[in-house]
């Protein structure tokens, strides 16, 4: 488990959980596709 990855996962879920269509990221501290998809979805929200 990576503490920085876990911190990012928690941040993603806190910031974007109220956005329609955002899939919650598992908070396990592991890198992987769900985390990458969460980062992409967050970026898309920010870019409009």
Residue ranges and their predicted role:
Residues 1-48:
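Cell-envelope/ECM-targeting effectors and their regulatory/trafficking segments
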């Amino acid at each position: 488990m990576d503490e920085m990855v876990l911190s990012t996962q928690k941040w993603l879920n806190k910031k974007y959980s109220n956005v329609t269509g955002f899939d919650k990221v598992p908070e396990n501290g592991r890198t992987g596709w769900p985390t990458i998809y969460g980062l992409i979805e967050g970026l898309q929200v920010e870019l409009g």
